[in-house]
Swiss-Prot record:
Protein name: Retrovirus-related Pol polyprotein from type-2 retrotransposable element R2DM
InterPro entries membership: DNA/RNA_pol_sf (IPR043502), Rev_trsase/Diguanyl_cyclase (IPR043128), RT_dom (IPR000477), Znf_C2H2_type (IPR013087)
Gene from which this protein is expressed: pol
Biased composition (Polar residues): 183-195
Enzyme Commission designation: 3.4.23.-, 2.7.7.49
């Protein structure tokens, strides 16, 4: 190679012709080797600004947005993409002069042409040009001449000929009871309808039940009389009798409103802290989850408005008139829904029990009292209600309570109304909802309230559509819609009409109509209750049947959307993703998205719902394949006359709890979410064990959804784990060199059980991706390859030392092995053989104070401040025992050998013996403590001899060091007493002819049981699991007593911690 010299110190530049960022030419990037210059182009730098000694400065490319300069256009492009993506979109955007026809536009124009032709319009080209304003008449004319377009016309006409006629399904006025009585029908002239047949089957089932043998308070004979006379008395009279019967077995109690006396004003800070601690502990005892969430969310500043404000507002919302009719196509189902309205079985009752923690309705029937009803009685009650097609008057009324949507809720609209009907109504509606849900062929685009991971399905679909559009430079237009008060505004007429359209049984439709038109509610607030009224619209949030009814209406909406409009993903088209009222629309063109918006708005207005245009937004991605890029363009979309906001590339938005931008999922930082909550948990008046419980069961699981479906880097997960471990060490006062594995290993293996997000997050993502079900994208190669790539990436993140941690047990085993390999955690190796002994670590029981729990954890991990522990790594310092023993001062030495702690060791041993003795006496055994057995081998004194049913059980207790196998120590103890001379002496002394068995209660000084020892004692009925847990705590306390005694006698009278 030849070196060339250039004057004035200038560096030669190689010129390129660029595409994509600034050049509008379509030529490829070609290096021009012959164009070697020594000064910049005149077009870029004027001559009067050029100086020979400033060539290095003049060769840099400046950024027009922030003024920063770069050495090359490539560097400027990287800078623009990372720092100014919105400005880069403006720079890249090009105007289409002769854009290609997309498949979506062809379908829309073909459908419009069929519509215009059917209406007898002439001059079709000019008419179509009005609707397709961005196309010229000549372009429309040429497209209509193409063969593929003509095929679409024929296909649409064929579909129109085969499609059923659209029927106006108007809700007619129901005939009154007198009008129904005057209608004369005879079985000879009128065929039996399915409704009558199902009623006969239900009544036949009621009569076929065998007599119930139960307590007299359930009045089985009175209920049987109601059933026997039902066909004679009629449904109204039967309902009245059933209502009186329910009042008899469930006396009206109502809901108690307890008024708490406000605490007196504290005199000082100490008394204020004590009052706060008392309030938190009282709430903790009532409901741990609610107490923890209230502490994590910070100060609840929500204030419910007064009754004078809440009642008029919500009464107006619930009683506003809604549309009385709904028009649409009748949905053709593959199978009948008659099973929904059939006799209830005992299996249905067991599967639909109301949770014991659920609140009672206005009738005062609690879930516990409902479960006490014999199944035979409950079956008769439920099936009688089915036969009558209506609820008894005593359980029709519901109460409506309000829960704040945010911690700053102060206006009536900031609260969510929750309906609380009777427990019996909830159980019956849960059965009907389960039957209806399993009988409907749901549209695959609706994933809410279904037995599937709908959040994962829809969030991943949105991510797939966005990333696929950018990867293949395809246009995509997305609209995220917000339905205003969807559950509170749905028209009742649309519910009845939709049920009929889906082929629901007449009895079920009548039941729903009767419960909505005849069931009232009262609004309940802070110490007040309004008068009863009947809502005219909306579904009852809190009722098990309401989500299914709402889903049916939204499912009907999805079926009305044009199938040819949507974002193309491989060989499939998807145009919507719905999760209850959270609706996202996709289209390939701007006009297509506007058509979907118009269709959605028309349907929602019919069913009484409205879109909140201010909370809706659109994302417009324009593909530019020639430039090999996509740009975000702000297009105008309308909901009625209101324009929807359009987002830019950098704008973030949330869908189903996951943050997105126009390019896909946004990288999240869980440390930012969990940091403030960890601080609140630190300041909260809780014990250390309560803080750990809150962290393990509530705070960390709150991150799982975002970590599993969002985007997060491994480094961020490690930093979050580090932050969590910092607070754990702070709460427990642990030294910094405590093994990391001790924090993350499960309690059953000896650790604290704090989940490690570094491993749990990829595992959860892999699990949720594996459970994704896309029925409409099953055969789609693009969707399948996208899912497989995401799952493989999650698997790669779960690779640890040639092992794949694909499940939670694998992760727990990984941390347990790392704990046992550490010096301080090796003594916990045998802790995994028996789980209940670790209950005090994972559950915040009242057995231990906060101080005792902290000391117990330090004892467990060998973190007590002995000389060997505090001088670790500094061998030149003195490490001998302070009591003068010829041994290093280790925790094991103090607990097991040092003479200063001998008295406490004896007390620790006796405490275990006394606990076992008490449990044996409670089981009816005769227990002798330390009997003296004079045998040939000498004097033997086992700790306990238990006599039961002419059998003898000998139990000896030992607390051993943790350096050896405890199972071997257990077996040595048994062999110590299981000898012929001792057996002979036992039979002679206690005159027992039965079997003689020898056992040991073997633990180490950390409170860990020998697996063989504790399992044998429990299997023989000599020890309960609860007692084994208590003994483990007592051993731990006794070991702490040994250490305190040693430190006290060593001159440490102050607190050694």
């Amino acid at each position: 190679f030849e070196r060339k010299n250039f004057s004035d110190g200038l560096v030669p530049q190689r010129k390129f012709i660029h595409i994509g960022t600034t050049s509008t030419n379509n030529e490829p990037r070609i290096p021009l080797h012959n164009l070697m210059t020594t000064r910049p182009s005149v077009d870029i730098f004027p001559e009067d600004q050029y100086e020979p000694n400033a060539a290095a400065t003049l060769s840099r490319v400046p950024c027009t947005v922030c003024g920063r300069s770069f050495n090359s256009k490539r560097g400027l492009g990287v800078h623009m993409r990372s720092r100014h993506p919105d400005e880069l979109d403006e720079e890249r955007r090009r105007v289409d002069i002769k854009a290609r026809w997309s498949d979506e536009e062809k379908w829309m124009m073909a459908r419009k042409e069929v519509e215009l032709t059917a209406n007898g319009c002439k001059h079709i080209n000019k008419q179509l040009a009005v609707y397709f304003a961005n196309r010229s008449v000549e372009a429309i004319k040429k497209l209509r001449q193409r063969g593929d377009y003509k095929e679409k016309i024929e296909q649409i006409r064929g579909q129109s000929a085969l499609a059923p006629e659209v029927a106006n399904l108007t809700i007619r006025r129901r005939p009154s009871r007198s009008e129904q009585d005057h209608q004369v029908t005879t079985s000879e002239t009128t065929p039996i309808t399915p409704f009558e047949q199902s009623n006969r089957e239900i009544l036949r089932t009621l009569r076929g039940y065998s007599p119930v043998e139960c307590h007299s308070k359930w009045r089985a004979q009175e209920l049987q009389t109601i059933i026997d006379r039902a066909h004679l008395e009629g449904k109204e009279t039967t309902l009245q009798c059933l209502s009186l019967y329910l009042l008899g077995i469930f006396p009206a109690q109502g809901v108690r409103h307890t008024l708490t006396r406000p605490p007196r004003r504290p005199r000082n800070r100490r008394e204020s802290r004590r009052q706060q601690y008392a309030v938190v502990q009282r709430n903790w005892d009532k409901h741990k989850g609610r107490c923890i969430k209230s502490l994590l969310n910070g100060t609840d500043e929500s204030v419910m408005p007064s009754q004078e404000i809440m009642v008029p507002y919500w009464r107006e919302v619930m009683t506003q008139p809604s549309p009385s009719s709904c028009s649409g196509e009748v949905i053709q189902m593959d199978h009948s829904l008659e099973r929904v309205w059939s006799a209830i079985t005992e299996q249905d009752l067991r599967a639909s029990r109301v949770s014991l923690s659920s609140s009672p309705g206005p009738d005062g029937i609690t879930p516990k009292s409902a479960r006490e009803v014999p199944s035979g009685i409950m079956l008769r009650i439920m099936n009688l209600i089915l036969w009558c097609g209506n609820l008894p008057h005593s359980i029709r009324l519901a109460r409506t309570v309000f829960i704040p949507k945010t911690v700053t809720a102060k206006r009536p609209q900031d609260f969510r109304p929750i309906s609380v009907p009777s427990v019996l109504v909830r159980q019956l509606n849960a059965i009907l909802a389960t039957r209806l849900n399993s009988s409907i062929n749901w549209d695959p685009r609706q994933r809410g309230f279904l037995p599937t991971d709908g959040c994962a399905d829809n969030a991943t679909i949105v991510d797939l559509v966005l990333r696929h559009s950018h990867k293949h430079f395809r246009s995509c237009y997305i609209a995220n819609l917000d339905v205003s008060k969807a559950f509170d505004s749905l028209s009742h007429a649309s519910i009845y009409d939709t049920l009929r359209a889906y082929g629901a049984p007449k009895g079920f439709v009548d039941y729903v109509q009767n419960t909505y038109e005849g069931g009232g509610t009262s609004l309940n607030g802070d110490g007040w209750s309004s008068e009863e009224f009947v809502p005219a619209r909306g579904v009852k949030q809190g009722d098990p049947l309401s989500p299914i009814l709402f889903n049916l209406v939204m499912d009907r909406l999805l079926r009305t959307l044009p199938s040819e409009i949507g974002a193309k993903v491989g060989n499939a088209i998807t145009n919507a993703a719905a999760f209850a009222d959270d609706l996202v629309l996709f289209a390939e063109t701007r006009m297509g998205l506007q058509v979907l918006l118009d269709k959605t708005l028309d349907f929602l207005s019919i069913v009484g719902l409205k879109l909140n245009a201010d909370k809706c937004f659109t994302v417009g991605i324009k593909g530019q394949p020639k430039q090999k890029c996509t740009v975000l363009e702000a297009q105008s979309f309308y909901v009625g006359s209101s324009e929807i906001p359009s987002l830019k590339r950098t704008d973030e938005w949330k869908y189903l709890g996951i943050n997105f931008t126009a390019t896909g999922r946004v990288r999240c930082n869980p440390a930012e979410d969990i940091g403030p909550k960890l601080q609140r948990l630190t300041k909260a008046p809780l014990k250390p064990q309560q803080r750990l419980f809150a962290l393990r069961t509530v705070l960390i699981p709150q991150l799982y959804h975002k970590l599993a479906l969002g985007s997060v880097a491994i480094g961020v997960l490690r930093k979050t784990d580090k932050l969590i471990r910092y607070y754990v060490r702070r709460w427990l006062n642990l030294p910094l060199d405590v093994p990391i594995a001790f924090v993350h290993a499960p309690p059953k293996s000896g650790g604290l059980g704090i989940p490690s997000l570094r491993w749990v997050a990829p595992m959860l993502r892999l699990r949720r991706l594996s459970n994704i079900k896309w029925p409409h994208l099953t055969q789609n190669e693009v969707a399948s390859s996208f899912l497989e790539a995401e799952k493989q990436r999650a698997r790669d993140r779960l690779l640890a030392e040639q092992n794949e941690l694909l499940s939670r047990p694998a992760i727990e085993k990984y941390w347990a092995n790392k704990l046992y390999l550490s010096v301080d955690g090796s003594g916990l190796r045998e802790g995994g053989h028996y789980g209940p002994q670790h209950g005090w670590v994972s559950q915040p029981t009242r057995l231990l104070t906060g101080k005792e729990y902290m000391d117990g954890i330090r004892l467990r991990i060998n973190a007590l401040p002995t000389k060997s522990r505090t001088t670790r790594g500094r061998h030149e310092l003195e490490r001998q025992c302070r009591a003068g023993c010829d041994a290093p001062e280790t925790t094991n030495h103090i607990m097991q050998k040092c003479y200063r702690s001998h008295g406490r060791r004896v007390a620790r041993h006796n405490c275990v013996v006394n606990r076992i003795k008490r449990g044996l006496e409670e089981r009816g055994c005769v227990v002798i403590v330390e009997p003296s057995l004079q045998c040939e081998s000498g004097l033997n004194k086992p700790d306990l001899v238990a006599l039961r049913q002419n059998h003898i059980d000998v139990i000896d207790t030992q607390i051993v060091t943790d350096g050896h196998s405890m199972d071997d120590a257990h077996q040595r103890k048994i062999n110590r007493y299981d000898r012929p001379d001792i057996r002979t002496e036992l039979r002679r002394r206690f005159e027992a002819a039965g079997d003689i068995e020898f056992h040991s209660a073997t633990l180490n000084w950390r409170g860990i049981w020998s697996g063989q020892s504790v399992k044998r004692l429990i299997a023989k009925g000599l020890l309960s699991k609860y007692d084994s847990h208590i003994i483990s705590v007592q051993v731990m306390r006794g070991s702490l007593g040994c250490f305190k005694q040693f430190m006290y006698l060593s001159g440490f009278s102050r607190d050694w911690t």
